[in-house]
């Protein structure tokens, strides 16, 4: 029993610590990529090419004073960042990085992830209410409405994948897409693929869906009153969720750790590449897409975001799920 606890704790640390480092350097990549897109240089002072900038940014945040607003609910004010941070990292417990390399290979892995990503909104809403600030409250209410609107579309997209794969286990979904690129689900489930990723951008409150913390309207939204390490927890949760959406999109629609050259003549050339490399390469594409979209599109109005979710994404995903269910039932399509 003790050995199991120690092994599990070690595995958790092997996931969480590298993930936090990736999050730190994802912020560096964001500033660099957007800088180049806007014909700027980006961070280049701290260390060679600015590579130490994330480390010093983290030190700056964690050394700052934690200020508690007057008349705020002190207990809820302190617990809200933890409620946002913990689910964002707990969701990684069921992510397989390669065959057998997973902390907990659940049969209901997708359901667990959906529950964890939905739970993060409680931290945001509590932060908005406990801060005793109208701007925080407005941001929290916007976040709640946005999550409800786009969680449904994401849920329907996941249902389509589950129907196609015949499994809610993440490993089962990846194995169902083995056999080369033509077996990946982004082809037959293309509308669900597009909707899932866009809904993931909205779910993480990233541009152009960042009305939750729209600077020109509500300053910084739900975390306007947070400083130091408490603000850093919200920051770490947001970027961890972005990476989670990227890796889930790779797993559900691009075959996960499967090589695109399976069952082709090129497999003999690329067969030596480990599955984890393919998974990280696909994930990196979507991580870049988050940054590209932010640098390209202006912020949508709140009514436009609601209209897109309720009038376009939800009906589209619902109809496509019905089509997928009928095709699976009739045995149509080479992907199943």
Swiss-Prot record:
InterPro entries: NADH_UbQ_OxRdtase_su1/FPO, NADH_UbQ_OxRdtase_su1_CS. It holds the Pfam family NADHdh. It is a multi-pass membrane protein. Its EC number is 7.1.1.-. PROSITE patterns: COMPLEX1_ND1_1, COMPLEX1_ND1_2. It comes from the Bacteria. The chain crosses the membrane at residues 4-24, 75-95, 108-128, 154-174, 181-201, 233-253, 272-292, 308-328. The keyword NAD applies. It catalyses: a quinone + NADH + 5 H(+)(in) = a quinol + NAD(+) + 4 H(+)(out). Its main location: membrane. It is an enzyme of class 7 (translocase). One of its GO terms (biological process) is aerobic respiration. Keywords: Cell inner membrane, Cell membrane, Membrane, NAD, Quinone, Translocase, Transmembrane, Transmembrane helix, Ubiquinone. It is found in: Cell inner membrane. One of its GO terms (cellular component) is plasma membrane. One of its GO terms (molecular function) is NADH dehydrogenase activity. The keyword Ligase does not apply. NDH-1 is composed of 14 different subunits. Subunits NuoA, H, J, K, L, M, N constitute the membrane sector of the complex. Belongs to the complex I subunit 1 family. NDH-1 shuttles electrons from NADH, via FMN and iron-sulfur (Fe-S) centers, to quinones in the respiratory chain. The immediate electron acceptor for the enzyme in this species is believed to be ubiquinone. Couples the redox reaction to proton translocation (for every two electrons transferred, four hydrogen ions are translocated across the cytoplasmic membrane), and thus conserves the redox energy in a proton gradient. This subunit may bind ubiquinone. This is NADH-quinone oxidoreductase subunit H. The gene is nuoH.
